[in-house]
From Swiss-Prot:
Its EC number is 1.2.1.38. The active site is at residue 149. NCBIfam families: argC (TIGR01850). GO terms for cellular component: cytoplasm. It is found in: Cytoplasm. The keyword Protein biosynthesis does not apply. This is N-acetyl-gamma-glutamyl-phosphate reductase. One of its GO terms (biological process) is L-arginine biosynthetic process. InterPro entries: AGPR_AS, AGPR_type-1, NAD(P)-bd_dom_sf, NAGSA_dehydrogenase, Semialdehyde_DH_NAD-bd. SUPFAM superfamilies: Glyceraldehyde-3-phosphate dehydrogenase-like, C-terminal domain, NAD(P)-binding Rossmann-fold domains.
């Protein structure tokens, strides 16, 4: 069994981790921390976990992770980087679901996240946890930087075109939509029911924190810098990401064959039949990314549709997928949930 600790177990990502790991046949939850809920039973806070988890939340300043093999951080940005070094020094592996170790250029990270990085020496070591790209590196990693929700959907949508050198990489467009759970569980005006319901809006058009992460990943696949216009939107649904991606083709290519070939052996990327239009509900509660490719009127623009659940493939599910790879387990173990309908 893999003994697991979770730092920050009360947010939406944290409770999704709990839901998945409580059912994982090779994982045993040992420690779950929360500053505000220390001493509270996990199942008292989340009734969905009654009969599944009997642990209480622990004070993160008093907890001992010595019995853990791996620790997940489901914390706000800036927390993991303060604690990871000590855990690694004790032989404990870390999977960080925050953005602390995703961007390799520390100065760029500090610019986007507005704080000084306290563990820059670990940034180079951290492996970016997108299995469809870095599976072999993940196997031997001590520290995983779990990708963000938008970056997962956007990168998986663009990667086959980028790797094939089939598009103008200076004019990529990502028009993305997210459910309100992507904003987290904290109370904010823009996610109140009366604000988010019956409403649809764009935000962070001038620059979103996930932009440098996406650019970094796609540039690595290209071998040279790419340019991307990234516009996120908030939609009146709880969970889900829908990315509509546009790219100008530079040569003739069979998009359907390209995508089916690239993802043929990927257990969680589903390339839909030609002409399909994936729905966010088709991945709700699952670790799947479903993709459809289009070339309107056989023109020179490729339109790629990519959908994920922001809390699963965009966060907790992908983190557990990375854990499975790190420990040599079947990659699909514990994360084969069928999407919820209706």
């Amino acid at each position: 069994m893999i003994n697991v600790g979770i730092v920050g177990g009360t947010g939406y990502t944290g409770v999704e981790l709990l839901r998945i790991l409580a059912q994982h046949p090779k994982a045993k939850l040992k420690v779950i921390t929360s500053r505000q809920e220390a001493g509270t039973g996990v199942d008292d806070l989340f009734s969905s976990l009654r009969g599944q988890i009997t642990l209480k939340f622990s004070d993160p300043l008093k907890v001992d992770f010595g019995k853990c093999d791996v620790v997940f951080f489901a914390t706000p940005n800036g927390i993991a980087m303060q604690q990871v070094s000590a855990l690694l020094g004790s032989g404990i592996k870390v999977i960080d679901l925050s953005a602390d170790f995703r961007i390799k250029d520390v100065a760029e990270w500090e610019e986007w996240y507005g704080m000084s990085h306290t563990a820059p020496e670990l940034v180079a070591e951290a492996v970016y946890g997108l299995p469809e790209v870095n599976r072999e590196k993940i196997r031997n990693a001590r520290l995983i930087a779990n990708p963000g929700c938008y970056p997962t959907a956007v990168q998986l949508g663009f990667i086959p075109l980028i790797e094939a050198g089939a598009v103008d990489e200076n004019h990529l467009i990502a028009d993305t939509k997210s459910g309100v759970s992507g904003a987290g569980r904290k109370a904010e005006i823009h996610t109140l029911y009366a604000e988010a319901s019956d409403n649809f809006k764009s935000y962070a058009v001038a620059g979103h924190r996930h932009l440098p992460e996406i650019r970094q990943g796609l540039s690595e696949r290209s071998g040279k810098p790419i340019d991307l216009t990234f516009v996120p939107h908030l939609t009146p649904m709880i969970r889900g990401i829908h990315a509509t991606l546009y790219a100008r083709l530079t040569r003739d290519v069979d998009l359907q064959a390209l995508y089916e070939s690239r993802y043929a052996n990927e257990p969680f990327v589903d390339v839909l039949p030609a002409g399909s239009h994936p729905e966010t509900r088709s991945v709700r509660g699952s670790n799947f990314c479903r993709i459809a490719v289009h070339r309107p009127r056989n023109g020179d623009t490729a339109v790629i549709l990519s959908v994920t659940d922001n809390l699963v493939k965009g966060a907790a599910g992908q983190a557990v997928q990375n854990m499975n790879i790190m420990y040599g387990l079947p990659e699909k173990m514990g994360i084969q949930h069928i999407p919820l309908l209706p």
